[in-house]
Amino acid sequence: MFNYNKDFFSGVYEKSDWIVSETFNRCIKFNNIKHFKEELIKTVNKSKENLKLSLLTSHPELTGKIEVKNLTKESLSEQKSAGLNKCSIEEFDKLHTMNNSYNKKFNFPFIIAVSGLNVAEIIKNFEIRIENTYDFELNEAIREVHKIASIRIDQKIKSLDRK
């Protein structure tokens, strides 16, 4: 049974609560969390490209030696869990260089669901994905955004279960 309101899901999409709001406005009832997540994906997929790009550009770069000032608490926690706050100088330099190259090529930041990954795995994904075409990478970045949102939803629900 789905007993949540839209405010509960604030922050699941990085600085893009319009997705949750629009999904709640479009759908009267959700059967369960899986159904809700599917409807969130539909909301993004049906949105115009400028909204999709806005969603992507609202995500922070993977910074290594995390620069806290512009990160949401969710992003800060996720990047710390992947060890980005403890990366070596070489890893930091590589991430910085790759961020610049990726942004130059695609005009949005590299996005990956970092939960469960380490710095080496993130860099490997970076190296693979920077070779993608724009259209492929746009869709890949959006898939990663949905993974991040799904993880955040699950964490919010688990936090309720612990109370």
What function would you assign to each model-found segment?
Residues M1-E14:
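Charged, compositionally biased N-terminal leader segments and the immediate start
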Residues M1-Y4, S47-L51, T133:
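Residues that cap or delimit alpha-helices
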Residues F9-G11, W18, F24-M98, I148-K163:
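Aromatic-anchored, charged helix-turn/loop surface patch used as a conserved interaction hotspot
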Residues S16-D17, F110:
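Residue-level signal for inorganic ion chemistry
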Residues W18-I19, V114:
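Conserved phosphate/anionic-ligand binding catalytic regions in large, soluble enzymes, centered on
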Residues E91-L160:
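C-terminal non-catalytic interaction appendages of large macromolecular assemblies
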